[in-house]
Amino acid sequence: MSAIDGLPPLREVIARHDLRAKKQLGQNFLLDLNLTAKIARAAGDLTGCDVIEVGPGPGGLTRGLLAEGARHVLAIEKDARALPALAEIATAYPGRLEVIHGDALEIDPLAHLTPPIRIVANLPYNVGTELLIRWLTPAAWPPFWQSLTLMFQKEVAERIVAQPGGKAYGRLAVLAQWRTEARIVMTLPPEAFVPAPKVHSAVVHLTALPGPRYPADPAVLNRVVAAGFNQRRKMLRASLKGLHPEIEALLIQAGIAPTARAEEIGLEQFCALARGLAAAPR
Ligand code: SAM
């Protein structure tokens, strides 16, 4: 079956450009263009948006983004072998696809884009988590992007959207949910990828809130959450002891039982504690 964009099927593209997946680049490709179109739709209405795609590889998701109407796609790819395949896509969508060859961890794509900007990526898990944390912790809020639509290992996706009370709830959940609305919008079995990874995957869609859910200084909140979850089995009066000599009183003032553990504490209480700490004389 020929694709709606008139380009060849992805299996053919991969064979022609000898794009055999390399493990060290975390390459697990999506070859089903119906699926990549569905992921592109999960990113929201792309018409009138510039989209940053990180790790386009042979371009399945890139084709989905363009077919779903993205105004402009800026694709950052580390593997030079993918560039000829991406150039063919750029020719099929004149003026709408720009490809940068490089490491997404080292490139600032902003110079190339006009808001509104959405970010979409199917990346190796470690690169994806590092970029997510950077995108969630800019110097100022709101950030330059409107939404992030990112593929993760399912277990990592569950940590991003986790609620208090379970093992999945930790720093990543607090960081993500403090300033975004985060949802799992799709789960994918290993067979959706070539080659198939060992684990299930999930797409998380994060929409930037105009401001944080509850006021707090980001650095203080980060300190509280890091200390609390680094020793998540300990009671907070012990795990947070190093933050302030009067930590028990500050916990009580924030409405938190000093005997509680970090994984029982919701965002609102963490923020109240961060405010109390910031205001407390030492
Ligand atoms: N988006 C394609 C798809 O869905 O079929 C490819 C996904 S594959 C999981 C990850 C892609 O990210 C590969 O093309 C790989 O070369 C690229 N990649 C890995 N590390 C990268 C980095 N640091 N910067 C940019 N691209 C990277």
Curated annotation (Swiss-Prot):
Keyword Cell cycle recorded: no
Superkingdom as given in the UniProt entry: Bacteria
Signal peptide positions (record): none
Subcellular localization(s) per the UniProt record: Cytoplasm
EC numbers on record: 2.1.1.182
CDD domains listed in its UniProt record: AdoMet_MTases (cd02440)
Primary localization class, coarse: cytoplasm
Residue sites binding S-adenosyl-L-methionine per the record: N28, L30, G55, E77, D103, N122
Family from the record: Belongs to the class I-like SAM-binding methyltransferase superfamily. rRNA adenine N(6)-methyltransferase family. RsmA subfamily.
Name of this protein: Ribosomal RNA small subunit methyltransferase A
Gene name as annotated: rsmA
